[in-house]
């Protein structure tokens, strides 16, 4: 029975979540030795992962939103330990979990403890890893939030313009992207670099992405000067934004932007004028549904 042992690292704000408590108790009643630890401040996720591994745990559970899942996934991948991860999505967007088919109810999510773990990729940039997606654009107020007005205009692609509170704030700048067999340069509005498929609560920016193919999906929204001025009218007239994207699938891509690029890395901000994004194949073992849409690249 020693293998029926796991440790849940739970975001502190979820400590009083009765659904989580009931799911944990149900697992314990089924014979699992399931311990719980709470995060309180920055750095706790990494510390708790290290403590869990030192104590001999080989199954960890990440309970929280996309940022918490990223922190725990990164810490576990960096530890290079023979341990696997179960995702307990408790955020508002839960983008990676939704795309992967992970149940959003705690009891059903914990059922994945009984499903064999599969190796999946992570993305890496500037020494930081991401589980789901990096989105970026130009603007001084890039955050994880997106204007409701902008969502109405741009639909799913609005999340690319994270934090731009008014359409008038959209700005294009020159960027250059280069990877194996791929070179693109020009004025761009925004981009998405996905290990997963969606961001912003269900918007598929990288619709064909697989989490186990050793590649990152790149989606670029170009901004020729004539398009920047008329984008709102084009979209309001019924032109779908998806066919405006330039897409690629690469093991790595280097981005150069003279004005600097604001990146949202699974909720974490990052900025730079030269950034290299790399796929880390098989960096993490995760218990996903056997029919997960994100699996298939390594089959």
Swiss-Prot record:
Cofactor binding mode and count: Binds 1 Mg(2+) ion per subunit. Ca(2+) may be able to substitute.
Cofactors required: Mg(2+); Ca(2+)
The UniProt record lists the EC number as 2.7.1.-
Classification via PROSITE patterns: DAGK
Q: Where does ATP bind?
A: 39, 65-71, 92
Cellular component, GO, one term: cytoplasm
Main subcellular location: cytoplasm
What is this protein's record name? Probable lipid kinase YegS-like
**Could you tell me which species this protein originates from?**
Pseudomonas fluorescens (strain ATCC BAA-477 / NRRL B-23932 / Pf-5)
